[in-house]
Amino acid sequence: MEVAKTSRTGEWAGAVKSFLADICVRAVNAVGQVENDERMVDLDDIKVEKRQGGSIKDSTLVDGIILDKERVHAGMPRSISDASIALINSAIEVKKTEVDAKIQITDPNQLAAFLEEEEGYIRQLVETIKASGANVVICQKGIDDLAQHYMSKSGIFAIRRAKKSDMEALAKATNGRVITNIDDLSKDDLGKAARVEERKIGDSDMTFITGCEEAKSVSVLLRGGTEHVVDEIRRAFDDAVGVVSV
């Protein structure tokens, strides 16, 4: 703790300095791994988000992952308890092939059949996700509007276009596996969290995946009244983490 306080956080008032140092030490301790009787800390396992608004003491450590994302459909639940999380790095949409591009539809019945086939494909994807036991989907790529609709009807919370680094952090935090082929998705691939929740932070929404048992990746949300203050806090925190992790 004292080491953290003597880094760049020393530029702040005593109470704030202690507060940030405590978050820093707890974050490092949470992700530290013991190898050959030595503690190893991968700083990439501490995900830092910053958001203007509130006070410095609104900053917090989360035993899980914070995503600067909101759910893709307003009809989806805003929060999920006892979350089972599917981590998918492929698009949840109809696959377009060269054959599709060359199809010439001249009859209304043909068009109806074609659209029905596409809808059936999307519906089956969502049913496969649902059958795995997933009630949360984090997708690295896009999610088709129709897929959003069916997920919403099924009570699934979904996020699209998550960063690759966030997918990797989520896998570490939730003990889940990132999968490419939805047809192969099973309950064994799902990550676990006590809660997944969309929260209003400052002027926009963020998603908090919290209560991850034995999380090997954690998140810190840094707050401050102005952009300048938040940037300074981020620099101070990064400096302190670097010192503590040595």
Region roles according to the model:
Residues 1-246:
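Core, soluble structural subunits of large cytosolic macromolecular machines
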